[in-house]
Amino acid sequence: SDWASVVEGLRGRDLSVDYAVVFQLRLPRAATAFVVGGMLGLAGVLMQILLRNPLADPYVLGVSGGAAVAALLAILLGWHVAGISGAAAVGALASMFLVFVLSRGSGDWSTTRLLLTGVVLASGWGAVVSFILAVSPDAHVRGMLFWLMGDISETFPGWIRLGLLIVSLLVAFGFARSLNLLSLGEL
C-alpha cells in the first residue's frame, strides 16, 4: 500500500484493508496509549504534590508492583482483559493501603517513612513478580511479559477512558490553586 491509499482511508472513502488497519487497529491503540499516558502522568504529579516529594511515584511507592502481582495472578487464572484490569486495580489499592499502614508504625507517618516503606514493598513485589514468572507455565509467560511492558493489543475505542481523563484533568485544574499552595509546603 502507498500513502495515497492511506490518505483515502483517512478521508473515509476507502473500505480496504488499509482503512481497517488504520481505523480498527492502529488508531484505537494509539488513542489508548495516549489516554493511559495522560492518566499515569496525572497520577504521578498528584502523588508528588500530595506527598510533597518529587521522588513519589507509583513505582517507588510499590503501587505498580502490587498491581503487577495481582494482574499476573489473574492471567494465571485465565481471566480476560476486564478481569485482569480489575485485579490490577485491586492490587494497586491493596498495595497503597499496605504502604500507608506499614509506614505509620506506632505514630504518625512522614513522607520519608512512606517513601522508604514504598521502596521496600516495591522490591518485595518485584521479587514476587520474578517468582511468578519463573514458576508459570510457558504458555502464560509471553502474555505476562507483554502485559508488564504495557500491552495494548486488546483494546477497544476508549471514549469512556478519554472522558475519564478529561474529567480527571478538569477536577485537577479546579484544585490547581490549592495544589500549588500545597506543593510549596509550609510558608
Protein language model regions, located:
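Alpha-helical transmembrane segments in inner-membrane proteins
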Residues: S1-L187
